[in-house]
Amino acid sequence: MAIRKMKPITNGTRHMSRLVNDELDKVRPEKSLTVPLKSAYGRDNYGHRTCRDRQKGHKRLYRIIDFKRNKLDVPARVATIEYDPNRSANIALLFYVDGEKRYILAPKGLKKGDIVSAGSKAEIKPGNALKLKDMPVGVQIHNIELQRGKGGQLVRSAGTAARLVAKEGTYCHVELPSGELRLIHGECMATVGEVGNSEHNLVNIGKAGRARHMGKRPHVRGAVMNPVDHPHGGGEGKNSVGRKSPLTPWGKPALGIKTRGRKTSDKFIVRRRNEK
């Protein structure tokens, strides 16, 4: 996979770049694994706007992804590697020997025709899923469960990978891409390898219309608004905030104020992501 820089034929294409996905299969998604996706476009169930910088974007079909990997000891063949508009990673369509079809996140190095499986007997290679207790220390993993049987919740974005650092009793030490070190139960499932499509973050959108197509609206700074619209607004020229601290459009403190609530799972964090 490579990044193609567009020729500056127009102002919109001057800095634009695209991913050249030669390895992707240009096929329609598996119909039995797709459902209609109703876009919320930044509104709540009353229709009130809750996020100012989102819009509907292009219509999408949601691909049902197997995050649980609970079909154990049944080999499957990779039929296709496909694009998924709902996530940064690509997805792989698996054909199991018993006839069932499932989508999984496509890890780096997985190719069409490869054989993958899940379970304690699976070998350590990209695409295979095992319990953390059955994996060797030092292996790269993704799609990690936090609760047994709930399905993978961590490390699912393109190009990300966690690392199994150590095993201690029934728990395993996992180092996440952010640098956080976390205890996860050894019975939780994870998939071997790094998530593919690692160059996804290097793409330059290039123009506003392409961002709108993705469902993104303009994000306007408060300093360029009028005083009636934002606490930072008003003044002649480029004025400072004019307050003791930056504020949100609704007058609450912003930038530097901690907003994360304490969770019962905090006790499993061995090292915070901002600690060395």
Swiss-Prot record:
Record key words, sorted: Ribonucleoprotein, Ribosomal protein, RNA-binding, rRNA-binding
Gene3D superfamilies on file: 2.30.30.30, Nucleic acid-binding proteins, Ribosomal protein L2, domain 3
Cellular component, GO annotation: large ribosomal subunit
Signal peptide: none
Origin superkingdom: Bacteria
Region (Disordered), start-end ranges: 223-276
GO molecular function term, any single one: RNA binding
Sequence ranges of Basic and acidic residues compositional bias: 263-276
Matches recorded under Pfam families: Ribosomal_L2, Ribosomal_L2_C
Any one biological process term the GO annotation gives: cytoplasmic translation
Function: One of the primary rRNA binding proteins. Required for association of the 30S and 50S subunits to form the 70S ribosome, for tRNA binding and peptide bond formation. It has been suggested to have peptidyltransferase activity; this is somewhat controversial. Makes several contacts with the 16S rRNA in the 70S ribosome.
Subunit structure: Part of the 50S ribosomal subunit. Forms a bridge to the 30S subunit in the 70S ribosome.
Family in the record: Belongs to the universal ribosomal protein uL2 family.
Name of the protein in its database record: Large ribosomal subunit protein uL2
Organism: Fusobacterium nucleatum subsp. nucleatum (strain ATCC 25586 / DSM 15643 / BCRC 10681 / CIP 101130 / JCM 8532 / KCTC 2640 / LMG 13131 / VPI 4355)
Gene name as annotated: rplB
